Amino acid sequence: MKMNMDQWTKELLEAPVKKALPVLSFPSIQLMGITVKELINDSDLQAKGMKAVADRTPNSGGAVSLMDLSVEAECFGAPIRVADDEVPTVVGPVLDTEIDEDERMEVAEALEVPEIGAGRTQIYIDAIEKAMDLITDRPVFAGVIGPFSLAGRLMDVTSSLIYCYDEPDMAHVVLEKSTEFIIKYIKAYKAIGANGVVIAEPLAGLLSPSLAVEFSGDYCKRIAEEVKDENFAVIYHNCGNTANVTLDSILSANANAYHFGNAVDMEEIMSKVPSDVICMGNIDPAGQFRNGTPESVREATLSVMEKCCKYPNFVISSGCDIPPMSSWDNIDAFFNAVDEFYAK
């Protein structure tokens, strides 16, 4: 359903009671009795899964698609590993780490930007188009990887951090191609009517403040400028532990909202951002949703809300993607705790 997302952002900021907006999609496999492997290869199952999650969580502020950070890298030729009960992962780079610097630059320059429809991208685009027909009571967000997180997977995650210092020109070549692809991919989601996109840039959380601007922030800003408008929102996600010291880089993206992980103190983040900038977070997805209990989830949720809801721009959420096999008792406990807090 078409929505004015500038108005949505304004109303969310002004609402005294804010709906939680966790990154919740993969646990749909439990509601449907399927595997992750089946989910990531079938647009109908993805759309039905998003609808099942929406029906189970009437008080959620949005429907978020799969945070599958293997999709884009796979299009560039990166090998991935798929399991029945875990999120897919990239298991090897596209650029050989064993060749010399000049050769690596040649490989980077020869890297082709995939067409939209390569790999599983069309499945994911079709899934959002189908979900838009099924979910009409809240915004529907697509999910894509961020520029440095994609480039890092193509270059090898550990090596990419070294390349920022030792081979910055090569890193920028890969970043340019990653950014070009991400923009095309988001525009494909926009064309089929998605209300917005969550851009997941976790790898930027490993960069120092000076590098974060050059190798992530500037590219995220360019992506947002290309795709964001009054009918299409951008939510920027960074679950790194340096988000508190790279806030200038993060906020330069000019997104509608920013989503933070549990590696940072959410109250510290809130104290540092302008009061008109929506920030979301940050209940531990693994420690609480996956491995906690309903009581521990309740306590963690109330604790974060008690510290952060005094800031009018705070929205309670998970710290990152909620793992596929997280207990629905824990997920229900999270939403119940949000209701409990606002009922006080």
Locate the predicted segments by residue:
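Active-site loop segments of alpha/beta catalytic cores
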Residues: 1-28, 36-37, 114-344
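Active-site loop/lid in soluble adenylation, ligation, and acyl-transfer enzymes
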Residues: 27, 31-32, 59-69, 74
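Surface-exposed strand-loop-strand hairpins of Gram-negative outer-membrane beta-barrel proteins
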Residues: 34-45
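Short amphipathic alpha-helical segment that frequently serves as the phosphate-/nucleotide-binding helix
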Residues: 44-47, 125
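Catalytic domains of carbohydrate-active enzymes, especially glycoside hydrolases
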Residues: 46-68, 188-195, 252-255
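Short, glycine/charge-rich beta-strand/loop segments that flank catalytic centers
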Residues: 65-75, 141-150
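Glycine-rich loop at the start of a catalytic domain that most often binds anionic cofactors/ligands
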Residues: 70-86
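A gly/proline- and charged-residue-enriched helix-loop-helix capping module
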Residues: 86-130
